[in-house]
Amino acid sequence: MNQKVVIIGGGLSGLASAVWLSESGWDVTILERRAALGGRTHAVSVPQVGDIADNGQHIMARAFVNLFRYLDAVGTMDHMHFSPIGSRMRDGSVHPTKQGMGSQLQMLFGALPGLPRRDRLKTTLACLRFFTQAARADIALDKITVAEWYRRVGMPDSAREIVFDLLALGVLNELPELASAYPLASLLSTAMKKSVRGGGSAFEFGYSDVDFDTLYVNGAQRIFSERGHQVHYRAIARQIEIRNGRAVGVRMADGDIIDADAVVCAVPAWNVRGLLDQVPGHDSVYAASAKLISAPIVSVNLYLDGPLGSEFWLENIASPEHIIDNVFDHQIMHPGRDTGRGFRYALTTSAAYMINDWPNERLIDAQMRLLRQCYPNSPHVVHANVVRENNATFTQRPGTALSRPSQQTQIPNLVLAGDWTKTEWCSTMEGAVQSASFAVSALQSSMSASSPVHVGI
């Protein structure tokens, strides 16, 4: 009889753990507290225009090797596409953004789109200092914010507005004035290493031509159905049961215990408290999770009666108002898309503290004013679907760099998974799936499985 693993949480880290453990012969049971799988990456219905959209458009990079291994496993990797992106200025001009190693060279030579001539030499010198320090990723950077780091290397405000503040917002989902500098340095160090190994293509950016449920969830559900695995929805786990130094099951909210030979706890940082009460060392995990507070992202699936006039599938908006960070053009992303019920654009705003509580009407009015300044056309709104993810990601403030816990616990058959655990990445989809890879590897090793799962890079 196959060994049984119970996975608490059906987000990306839980799904990847389930699929890979299933591949190596485990009997899998998933406990998901919501009514659907996918966690913080899921599709949303927009019945007003008869469309299926997402709860927030994501950018993916070729360096996301663990995420793409998961897509291969569930049969959806062929939905990924990679193509150039651009930067859109307030004056309506748009500039192609260099990708891979080219983006770093563009910055080093002060050739940022829209950068005033007077700031080019300053930007070059600042970038030399910035990327040199990023490559080292000194833990001392955890004592200062990203904004302070920019000031120390002499980064001009113009360069920050055009690229560097958007960089921090995009990868950390936090304001430069609040985010620790170390996670940004660590991610850039990882990026540079992977770019060298990948011939400069590791940080080419891409998107999928299907919704999140189709991309991440449906293929996994097919696997679970074909292999007889169980998925329990609206299943609230209360505590992992430990006996004689091993996990033996999961106690549910109704008092029932689901037996297990192993447990993967794949919940967000803010949901872990209570689950590990019987686990030695749980206080340190709870303390770590308390430091990794959540940050919001506001996304708008915008349907217009005509095209904006985008030139790239993704255009970053260089604007100090921080009302829109990115504009995704679904007509470019999905050639031949039926526009009879509206031209669809996805707008995203990271670390959206300022606009998160705005009424929808105020938000859309402000965003449309900005779009009309930046784009050649001025279409009208057909419908706007606003999605507020209050707990979109965790955020790392100064002093939290060493807080993220390992996937391995003091219980050999219990592992943690989730983007908030220790990985090479900050709070990203790749971080979530890499955590699953690490968790599965740790579990297989501790259980001395005869056929260990192939782990990602």
Model-identified regions with their sequence ranges:
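Glycine-rich active-site loop/strand segments that organize a redox cofactor
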Residues: G39-R62, F130-A134
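Helical element adjacent to the flavin cofactor pocket in flavoenzyme catalytic cores
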Residues: T190-D254
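Glycine-rich FAD pyrophosphate-binding loop
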Residues: S22-P47
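N-terminal Rossmann-like FAD-binding beta1-loop-alpha1 element of flavoenzymes
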Residues: Q3-I30
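Conserved flavin/dinucleotide-binding core of flavoenzymes
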Residues: Q99, L314, I324-I457
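Mobile amphipathic helical/loop "lid" adjacent to a hydrophobic cofactor/ligand pocket
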Residues: L67-A73, M77-K193
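Mid-domain catalytic core of redox enzymes
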Residues: I236-A346, S350-D357, E361, L370-C374, ...
